[in-house]
């Protein structure tokens, strides 16, 4: 029987600030969707909701997931330590 890994979730400062921004703005649907995506990330960070695909260029190694048409969750996956590092959860790729 193959044991499925569970990824540890790490929250960077910018991600936590973005969550507060969504709370202050009353974006409950964004917060609900983020919670669901984070649960998915624990099991399979490279597939699932929000059209994940690796970024290229200066963001190589990072992955986006669509939260809304305007907002993206950006994260990095560290297979060696089975960790997903949540970087940000606001507007596209830091263009605020």
Residue ranges and their predicted role:
Residues 1-8, 16-32, 36, 56, ...:
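Enriched for short, Lys/Arg-rich terminal
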Residues 8-9, 48:
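Residues that recognize and position ribonucleotide moieties
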């Amino acid at each position: 029987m193959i044991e499925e890994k569970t990824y540890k979730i790490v929250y960077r400062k910018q991600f936590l600030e973005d969550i507060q921004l969504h709370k202050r703005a009353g974006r409950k649907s964004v917060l609900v969707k983020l919670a669901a995506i984070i649960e998915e990330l624990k099991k399979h960070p490279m597939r699932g909701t929000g059209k994940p695909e690796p970024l290229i260029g200066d963001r190589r190694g990072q992955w986006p997931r669509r939260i809304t048409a305007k907002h993206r969750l950006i994260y990095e996956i560290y297979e060696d330590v089975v960790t997903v590092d949540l970087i940000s959860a606001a507007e596209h790729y830091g263009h605020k």
